A protein has these predicted regions:
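Long, charged, mostly alpha-helical binding arms that flank functional sites
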Residues: 4-166
Length: 166
């Protein structure tokens, strides 16, 4: 670049065409075009970006479906938000500050060791995928971890414990 006498980007990933949900080219004339500003306003940029990166590889054509964006917003971001809200509520009730002494992993309950192990595996998988410029499997792995392991298993099996009853 002009400022730093170096290239602006070392690597670029370019996406393919964004098609309608049936795989046809979007066109105002055909009535299948989507106003991106309306979609961003209604669902938010994070949901749109996540939908696009998790739905298909960036270099493949993307069959864009607004219902898919809504599903990502509800099922992934909604689950992530609810999981965090659950944690924040009970952490505040218990006076958790994050400055407590760290409990060694070996001394934690088995279910805590399980989720930590899965998280470490997830970090490794996501790092490898991103280093190989393969973002879609990384996004899908994160989504699966949040929806299935963190929310459906870990939080549900630990509710009584988090509520102070176990």
């Amino acid at each position: 670049t002009m400022l730093f006498d170096s290239v602006a980007f070392k690597n670029i990933i370019s996406n393919g065409l964004v098609l309608d949900k049936n795989g046809n080219k979007m066109s105002k004339r055909l009535g299948n075009a989507v106003d991106p500003f309306e979609v961003l306003e209604k669902y938010g940029t994070d949901a749109v970006r996540w939908y696009m990166i998790s739905n298909s590889q960036p270099w493949d054509n993307l069959k864009f479906d607004v219902d898919g964006v809504d599903e990502v917003r509800r099922k992934f971001f909604g689950t992530l938000y609810n999981t965090y809200s659950f944690f924040a509520l009970y952490a505040n009730v218990d006076g958790f500050t994050g400055r407590e002494a760290e409990i060694p992993v070996a001394e934690r309950p088995e279910i805590d060791r399980w989720i930590i192990s899965l998280l470490n595996t997830l970090v490794k998988e996501v790092t490898e995928s991103l280093e190989n410029y393969d973002p879609t499997p990384a996004a899908r792995a994160i989504q699966d971890f949040v929806n299935e392991n963190l929310s459906n298993w870990y939080v549900r099996l630990n509710r009584k414990r988090f509520w102070g009853g176990g």
